[in-house]
Amino acid sequence: MKKNRQWKKWIPIYILGLPGILYLLINNYMPLYGLLIAFKDYNYSLGVWKSPFVGFQNFEYLFKTKDAWVITRNTIGYNLLFILLNTVIGVALAIFLNEVRKKVSKKIYQTAILLPYLMSMVVVSYLAYIFLGDRTGMINHLLTSLGLPPVKFYMTKTYWPLILTFVNEWRNIGYGTIIFLASIVGISESYYEAAELDGATKWQQIKLITVPLLKPTVIMLVTLSMGNIFRSDFGLFYQVPRNQGMLFSVTNTIDTYVYRALLQSGDISLSSAAAFYQSAVCFITIIIFNNIIKKYSKENALF
Amino acid sequence: MKKWKRVLSVVMMLIMALTMVTGCSSKKSDEDPAKNVTDDKTATDNGEEPYELVIEVVNISQSFADIEAVQEAINEITVPEINCTVKLMTVPIFEQGTRLSMMVAGNEKIDLVNTGLLTSPSTLVGEGLLADITEYITPTMKELAGDLLAAGTFDGKVYSYPAILYPGTVACLFYDKDLAEQYGIEVPEAISKSEDWENILKQVKDSGMSAYGISLGDGGGASIMEFGANLDGLGDNNTLSYGVVVDPEENTTITNWYESEDFAQLCNDHYDWMQKGYCVPDSLTNGYTTIDSMANGECFAVTSSNSVGMSQAYLSNLTGKNLEMVMVREALLTTGYVNTQSWGVASNSENPEKAVQFLDLLFQNAELANLMNYGIEGSHYAKVDGTQNIVAFPEGKDASTVGYGGDIISWFGDTKTAFQRTPNTDEFFDTIDDYGLEGAKKSLCLGFTFDTSKVATQVAAVQSVVGEYKPTLTTGNVNPDEVIPEFIKALKDAGIDEVIKENQSQLDAWLKTK
């Protein structure tokens, strides 16, 4: 009886929440129905429901070729590397920035490292080309003026893991740094004052105060990136290597593979299958990662 | 009192929630006010309301200021003739690939659409986007299109109608006439063998001019020498991954082009030229098209696969050079070429019959075609003095300032009777028959379309392999002796043999019914 009344008490609150709930339902849950397309031979005039069901046939092209292993390895490998570097370099830069005392220079540095993040990947790809071009590239100009043979970057795959990592860090590091910096700024000054009174060095302060207090932010950002481990930055892997076939074994990721394979036919069922596969893997990864976090540091787990 | 307050709050919440929900769905009713206006004005004698035909006009990106005036002028022809009004819907080319599917999925009103510009009619049919128009095709239309009609026929039903009745495509070389005279370079009348190419390129190199002989492009799409080899790609002229028919006017055996000696020869030649410095060295990555390279003076010649509109005059204007054409391969008609631009009726059209009637009228009434292509004479175009059928922008207007038609990509009507824009000249109409059924060579497979649905996985995989290996090979950047065997093996692993086998069996079945 009591329980019942409590339920009734919350009705106005639920109604207040209704628009939001409806929004979530319409925007985030109803489209889930579209997942069906991945298992159908989609036909616009028949619609989603009536199109013939084909089971897992749409997924075959993702696994059937020798590329399956390469694209999986590249996607996950690059992502793990990027997550690691983004975190380490981001935290380091944030700490450095925090130590800059002059307001003007701090703002200048902050803007400078964030600026590349605002650039389109197409622009970035041309910037890279200015450095790496065969005939017109700056690096090759330098090499030839030193009497060294020029390097055909766009045909030599050994350089590309390094180039892609560099470009990715150069472009994205500013964004992570800003988030870390925001949490560092939030750390109370009194910890540092107390530490200074006790005679702690700068390094000790960083190691024993800043980093431990940054841990929740780091864990959250890493968990979120884990949720994207099977997706890749299409611009980075397609535009920056200029779609060069010779480089595919180190630049081909699941997104670029799907794009190239379906460019001609534009088949909506096959592309949905790829997206479904990516989402499924990401979902599993994020659940596993979250459980690991739960085990070691329960209060920092996302859910 | 307190209770009332609660009830009141609940009611308020409900109202708020409701308005939010209904706010999303009140879009449809006020969509086309134009419809009502035109309907009032044009009710005709037989009492039947004229049907409003929505026609997709693909352009680059402009929105035409005078589109309604043009619509009215068109209606003056169409209402008495076939009792319909038109509504022109401009669609920028970058949206065209997705617009039709969005409109059909959302059941928005659309009738006549461009097919083939970005997506082939067969793909659109497979996705259920086109209506079956077999029964509406008039005898005149049948006669005009002749064998070309087969290209838009799938499983015995007509789904698309060729927009250009002279769709033959030639392979040719354009070279800079001024440079050739200045440096005394002799270019033969026609090119057929690899020695001919070598001969020209060597002369260019030895002449000491600052330009390279030619640019091999970025390897996307088929290279010119492949067109020169007289191939029918059976619906995939880009990656040639369905297998090809060589000399299709007398042969119907599908082979793997990448295994052929001709392909190896081509790659060897290109590699050789690259080594000798005949070609732009970084064409693979520099982001310029071959036409760009020609325009900026980087090369002496440019290869091109030309349809009827892409004349010498047109390309000269585009590159700003005085170009001369050399034939590499005479015009060929294949399903793929016919389907590069055609008309279809959207599967959700309420009146496909009317849409086809309009097409029928369009191909017979040059006045209507000119209206659709160029707008109203005087305000949107002007006849060029001393020509029969050539038009230009009116005085003081150009492509970006004219009120209609500045950047239209769609083509309306019969190419032979409608006007052409400058820089084409009246000569255009003399050569036109070379590109049509009368003058062009006809592939035996004209009308056949490969249904890839049974081997969709293999096709996707093969296309991905072609994308990986082909560009560097055909642009002469890698040694073919090392890479071709690897390429062939990757193709076989991807299942090209299954694709070709399926394609051949479909082709044989199709040939029997012919």
Residue ranges and their predicted role:
Chain B
Residues L100, V104, W197, V204-K205, ...:
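Hydrophobic residues within well-ordered alpha-helices
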Residues S122-T123, G221-D247, N268-A399:
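Extracytoplasmic/periplasmic substrate-binding proteins
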Residues T19-G23:
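C-terminal motif of bacterial Sec signal peptides marking the signal peptidase cleavage site
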Residues K157-E226, V244-T285, S347-K354, L361, ...:
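Helix-loop-helix "hinge/cap" segment bordering the ligand-binding cleft or interdomain interface
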Residues M1-K3:
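N-terminal secretory signal peptides that target proteins for export/translocation
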Residues D111-T115, G213, F300-S305:
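Paired acidic/hydrophobic, glycine-rich loop segments that form the ligand-binding mouth/hinge
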Residues Q357-P471, T475-N477:
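Conserved small-residue motifs centered on glycine
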Residues R6-S9, C24-E189, K193, T252-N256, ...:
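Conserved N-terminal structural module of periplasmic/extracytoplasmic solute-binding proteins
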